[in-house]
Amino acid sequence: MEERSVLMERYVIGRQLGQGTFGKVYYARNLSSGQSVAIKMIDKEKILKVGLMEQIKREISIMRLVRHPNVLQLFEVMATKSNIYFALEYAKGGELFHKMARAKLNEESARNYFQQLISAMDYCHSRGVYHRDLKPENLLLDENETLKVSDFGLSALAESRRQDGLLHTACGTPAYVAPEVLSRKGYSGSKADVWSCGVILFVLVANYLPFHDRNIIQMYRKIAKAEYRCPRHFSAELKELLYGILDPDPSTRMSISRIKRSAWYRKPIAISALNNETGKKSCTSEAPFSGPTICISSERNQEPPNLHNLNAFDIISLSTGFDLSGLFGERYGRRESLFTSRKPAAAVLVKLKELAKALNLKVTKTDNGVLKLATTKEGRKGRLELDAEVSEVAPFLLVELKKTNGDTLEYQRMMKEDIRPSLKDIIWTWQGDQQ
């Protein structure tokens, strides 16, 4: 592909960003919007020769199914007689792998990336999608240091399980792969991804692999027995978390929900860690960590009124430009609504309680400040229940209303006819509205 060529009369193609066995990746610009994208060009003939067409189709279906602030977004797919083209979100910051090679990360910075990774995996697993090839090379960064999980070519959908409910194909890079996957037995996709996340966390802080040996058989044995040693500078809380994640027995390995409840994970991140990380760490990398892919945690302790303090990557999905639901025909199938408000937190909470009273909704408040609202009468699918969560994003508040039980159509109707009109006095912007 020649530099400055135009693809499908929609994208101006620029420099080459990378190259793989089956194609190349280019920087490009959308002619109509001016948006920067990455164009992944795949040679049809090459993938047909090796029988990978189904894998490409799977990657397309998965990337359309998974839309999350910490998953690299697929905007559209195009094709000619010779090539398939993916128009993808452009991750200007490059691979997390390269950032780790330039400088060590302290635990606070590593926690920032790990929370985003766990948030992305939690979302994917809730959609029945398992990555199966998580490693630093498949974790990209945008210009704001937001993590982007990429390369779903080896991913498995829940539908690909056998009758025993387990996956049976060994995938991934050996150094990051769970022992049950290497044994070629049936395995849980979610448990296998959790193991890979644990290896990535170790590498983020140690700057080398927990399981490494020049002899591949010896490395497999170390993985099977979870034989590793943490550096002295690891905190006790981090060691405890890794011990739970890098458990060779998948039945007792930590789940994502347990990871989110762990002491190390729940520690708040200083905003300066996000704004000043790039280029501010002077430690030099000395150890290898390449073996032979958020929304952030909502479980941080805050001062009263116990609001969550979010950073840039939490609110990226509020941007109209990132609201991709229209591409996939699900604009009216949402189970959550987001809006911002410039009113004080106390005023927003009072308004939500007034709304609940007017609609005859039962109100309960959880320990982490979430308001739980529920109808008193049964609907088509039981009682309609929703969570109202208020988060602080200076200089405004972010309010998320999420259906947790009941019929989606009833929720949409209540949102359109009752809730949104009643809250108009406190709404500044509503997700999906044109600015």
Curated annotation (Swiss-Prot):
Residues 11-265 form the Protein kinase domain. ATP binds at residues 17-25, 40. Residues 334-363 are annotated as: PPI. Residues 151-180 are annotated as: Activation loop. GO terms for molecular function: ATP binding; protein serine kinase activity; protein serine/threonine kinase activity. Keywords: ATP-binding, Kinase, Manganese, Nucleotide-binding, Serine/threonine-protein kinase, Transferase. It comes from Oryza sativa subsp. japonica (Rice). InterPro entries: Kinase-like_dom_sf, NAF/FISL_domain, NAF_dom, Prot_kinase_dom, Protein_kinase_ATP_BS, Ser/Thr_kinase_AS. Induction: By salt stress. It is an enzyme of class 2 (transferase). The keyword Manganese applies. GO terms for biological process: signal transduction. The active site is at 133 (proton acceptor). This is CBL-interacting protein kinase 28. Gene3D superfamilies: Kinase associated domain 1, KA1 (3.30.310.80), Transferase(Phosphotransferase) domain 1 (1.10.510.10). The keyword Nucleotide-binding applies. Belongs to the protein kinase superfamily. CAMK Ser/Thr protein kinase family. SNF1 subfamily. The activation loop within the kinase domain is the target of phosphorylation/activation by upstream protein kinases. The PPI motif mediates the interaction with the ABI (abscisic acid-insensitive) phosphatases. Its cofactor is Mn(2+). CIPK serine-threonine protein kinases interact with CBL proteins. Binding of a CBL protein to the regulatory NAF domain of CIPK protein lead to the activation of the kinase in a calcium-dependent manner. Residues 283-329 form the NAF domain. It catalyses: L-seryl-[protein] + ATP = O-phospho-L-seryl-[protein] + ADP + H(+); L-threonyl-[protein] + ATP = O-phospho-L-threonyl-[protein] + ADP + H(+). The lineage of its organism: Eukaryota, Viridiplantae, Streptophyta, Embryophyta, Tracheophyta. Its EC number is 2.7.11.1.
